[in-house]
Design a protein with these regions (language model features):
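Short, hinge-like loop/turn segments at secondary-structure boundaries
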Residues: 44-47, 114-117, 156
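A contiguous, well-structured "functional interface" segment within a domain
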Residues: 2-6, 14-18, 141-156
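NAD(P)+-binding Rossmann beta1-loop-alpha1 motif at the extreme N-terminus of oxidoreductases
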Residues: 1-47
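Rossmann-like NAD(P)(H) cofactor-binding subdomain of soluble oxidoreductases
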Residues: 52-55, 59-152
Length: 156
C-alpha cells in the first residue's frame, strides 16, 4: 500500500517509520533541513526500546511522489492552505485523506445529520480550498496517542 505523509514533523515523523516497518510503501512531503536529513539518512524514530529508521522517498514537491493509496496530513492548521494547493498530485479519485492534527476538522458537519448538517466552517477553510481540493467525502479524522518531538532534523 502506497501511503504519503504530508508533513514529516513530530506526528508524521512518528507515523512514517511505523507504517514502513509494517510493510507500507511510505513517502513524505517535508521541507528545509528536515527534508535534507531525511533524503540523506532516512527518517529515524527513537523509541524507548528500539530505533526505527525508514528510508522513505521524500520531497518538497508532492508531484514527485505519485498517486497514493492513502494520504495522511500531519501539519499544523496554518499550513492547511498550502496542503490544499499542493495535494492534488497525490490523489486518485478514491484516495482517502486522514487528518492527524489538532482541532475541529474543517469537514466536521458534512453529512452529520444534525441541525448543522452540511454547514461549512469558514474559519477553518476560509476559501473552501480544502473542500474543493480534497472533499469531505474522502476525509477522515485521526487520533495519534503518543507524545512526539523532532529531536533534530530527520530524527523524531
Amino acid at each position: 500500500m502506497k501511503i504519503c505523509i504530508f508533513g514529516a514533523g513530530a506526528i508524521g515523523g512518528h507515523l512514517a517509520p511505523r507504517l514502513q516497518n509494517a510493510g507500507a510503501d511510505v513517502s513524505v512531503v517535508a521541507r528545509g533541513e528536515h527534508l535534507a536529513a531525511i533524503q540523506k539518512d532516512g527518517l529515524t524514530l527513537e523509541l524507548p526500546d528500539r530505533v526505527l529508521n525508514a528510508r522513505v522517498k521524500a520531497s518538497e514537491d508532492p508531484g514527485e511522489l505519485g498517486k497514493q493509496d492513502a494520504v495522511i496530513v500531519a501539519v499544523k492548521a496554518p499550513a492547511l492552505p498550502d496542503v490544499a494547493a499542493r495535494i492534488a498530485p497525490l490523489l486518485r479519485s478514491d484516495t482517502p485523506v486522514v487528518f492527524a492534527m489538532n482541532g475541529i476538522p474543517w469537514w466536521y458537519f458534512h453529512a452529520n445529520g444534525g441541525p448543522f448538517d452540511g454547514r461549512r466552517l469558514p474559519l477553518l477553510d476560509p476559501d473552501d480550498a480544502l473542500w474543493h481540493a480534497i472533499g469531505p467525502q474522502r476525509s477522515l479524522g485521526g487520533v495519534v496517542y503518543s507524545s512526539n518531538t523532532v529531536v533534530r532534523p530527520g530524527v523524531v
